[in-house]
Amino acid sequence: MRGPPRGVRGADMTTSEPGGATPKPTPRPTPHPTPRPVPRPSRVAPVVAAAPSSDPHRFGRVDPDGTVWLITGSGERVIGAWQAGDTESAFAHFGRRYDDLHTEVALLERRLATGTGDARKIKSAAAALAESLPTASVLGDVDALSARLSSILEQADEAAQNERAQRDEYRAAQTARKEALAAEAEDIAANSTQWKAAGDRLREILDEWRTITGLERKADDALWKRYSAARETFNRRRGSHFAELDRSRVSARQAKEELCERAEALADSTDWGATSAAFRDLLAEWKAAGRAAKDVDDALWQRFKAAQDTFFSARNAAHAERDAEFKANAAAKEALLAEAEKIDLSDNEAARAALRVIGEKWDAIGKVPRERAAELERRLRAIEKKIREAPTGGVDPEAKARADQFRARAEQFERQAEKAEAAGRTKDAEEARASAAQWRQWAEAAAESLEKRR
C-alpha cells in the first residue's frame, strides 16, 4: 500500500486498520498434519469482483480546512485531515486506500469461490476486515464491502463445515482401512500356518499401513498397537513351530537311523517269507517316523533302500531259480505222463507195477509251478483209474479196487506230508506220514489177499 503523502495528518493516519496501516501481528497457528482432501467442486457461487472503480466523490467530502469525511448509509464520519495538496489529491489518496481494501475483499472472494484456500483462514481474514471497516480511512462504497464481507463470512462458515465433513469422511475412510489391515493381521497371527506367505503378507500390510494418514492420533496409536501385537503373536507362533519342527526332525533322524540298522541286519536273510513281512513292517514304521532335515532324510532313505534292495534282489534271484526248477520238474512229469499213457493194460499186474515205478519217479521229481500242479495231478489220476479199472483175469474186481484205493490214499498222504514239510509245518507233516503208513499197511494187506486168491 502506498504511504501517505507529505502534509497528511490526523490520528487516523497512524491507525493500524486495513487500508490504513499494517494490521497487528497475530500468532501463526501451529500447522497440524491433515489429510489432503480429494479435489472438490466449488461450494459457493463464484463471485466476480468488480474493478476498483468506486467514485470517492460519491462516498465522501473534503472540508476547506482539509477535514476528510466518509459518507455511509449510517451517516458521516471523519477519516482524516488533508493538507498535502488540493481536494482532488485527497479524494485520489483515500480512494486508492479503498481500492486496496476492495482488492483484499475480492481476493478472499476468489479464494473462497475456487476452493484454493482454507475456509477457516478466509473466514478469519474476512472477520478482521469487517471489524476494521468502521474505522477504515478510505473513501468508497464501504457499505458494499461490508455486505460482501458478510456474505464471505456466511459462505466461509458453510465451506468450513463442508471441509470439516470431508475431513471427517476422509479420516473415517482412512481409519476403516487401518481397521481392516489390523483385523487381517490378527487373523493371520491367530490362524495362518503358511509361514512364508503369511510373513510376506504382514510386510505388505506394513508397507500399506505407512501410506495411510489423516487419522486421529489416539485411534492411530490404538490400531498400531493391534497390528504390532498381531505381528509379535505371529512371530512367536512361527518361532515355536520351527523349534518344534527342529525337535521332530531330530527325533525322526534318530528313529530312521535305528530303522536303517534293523534293515541292514535283515539284508542277507534267506528266510524269504518272514523277512519280506519284516521289511513291510519297517517301511510302515519309516513312513510314521516323520521327516528329518531334507539332506539327512534323503541320505537315510538311500541307506534304508540299499538294504531293502539287497534282500529283495536276492529273494527275486532265488525265486527265479526256483521257478526254473519247477518248470523243469513240470517238463519231467509231462514225460512221465507220456510214458504212463503207453502202459500195456493186457497184463494187469505188469501195468500196476509199471505205474508204481512211475509214481515213485513222480514223487521224486518234486514241485512244479503252482498253476500246473492241479492239471498234472489230474492227468496222473486219470491214468491210475484206467489201469485200476482194467480187467484182472479172475481177481475179484471189488477187492482189487479196494486195494488200489488204499494204495492211492497212502500215496495221497505221503504227498501231503512232503508239502507240509516243505512249508515248515512239521506237525502236519508227521500226522500225514502216520496216515500214509496206516493206509500203506492196509494196501499191502489187501494186495497179499489178492495174491492168495489167484
Swiss-Prot record:
Knockout-associated phenotype: No visible phenotype.
Keyword hit for DNA-binding: yes
Keywords: DNA-binding, RNA-binding
Induction context: Constitutively expressed throughout the cell cycle (at protein level).
Biased composition (Basic and acidic residues): 397-433
Source superkingdom: Bacteria
Disordered: region residues: 1-60, 390-454
Bias type Pro residues, positions: 24-40
Keyword S-adenosyl-L-methionine set for record: no
GO MF assignments: DNA binding; RNA binding
Biased composition (Low complexity): 41-52, 434-448
A Pfam cross-reference name: DUF349
Other remarks on this protein: There are about 700 copies of the protein per cell during exponential growth.
Subunit structure, as described in the record: Monomer. Binds ribosomal protein S1 (RpsA), RNA, ssDNA and dsDNA.
Name of the protein in question: Uncharacterized protein MSMEG_2731/MSMEI_2664
